[in-house]
Amino acid sequence: QVTDYLSALCQELADMGFDEILLDNAGYPYDGQVGVLATSENRPEDRTVPVSAFYARLAGELEAKGVCLSVCAYEDLAPGDEVYSGMTAGVLAQNVGRVWLDAGVSREHYEAILATGGFDNPAARIVSPAGAAGEGSWYR
């Protein structure tokens, strides 16, 4: 139900004329005491599968409308294959147009991580805070 709602919301934004949709924290919870959450039967062993399926669904629907699906990523989300969030470099490479970085993330380090995950031309598809935010922008 949640993915259906988010899909409908993203499509509505695309119909309003937005050319890029940026998702933030669009994976399984990864910060704090997530071990408590990991005991539920609803939490799959390999969280990359549902996260990748969710991104692929949105990316396909948005691409048909000429809209780029982007994701905000943090340093600890993509370096490995075993992450709590399910959002790895490989998942991002397969499904998103651009990756927006948190202010504390090294752009060069992240370019290498994403290239290893199969991200084509990561330098052109990464947005970092340095020089990206215009006057009055929320992105810093």
Q: Residue ranges of each PLM-predicted region?
A:
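Active-site-adjacent "subsite" loops/lids of carbohydrate-active enzymes
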Residues: 1-11
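Generic structural signal for well-ordered alpha-helices
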Residues: 10-11, 51-59, 89, 111-115
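Active-site-proximal loop/short-helix segments
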Residues: 19-48
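Aromatic-lined carbohydrate-recognition surfaces of secreted/lumenal glycan-active proteins
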Residues: 22-24, 45-85, 100, 122-131
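Extracytoplasmic/secreted cell-surface and envelope-processing proteins
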Residues: 30-33, 78-82, 108-112
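Substrate-binding cleft of secreted/luminal carbohydrate-active enzymes
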Residues: 90, 95-140
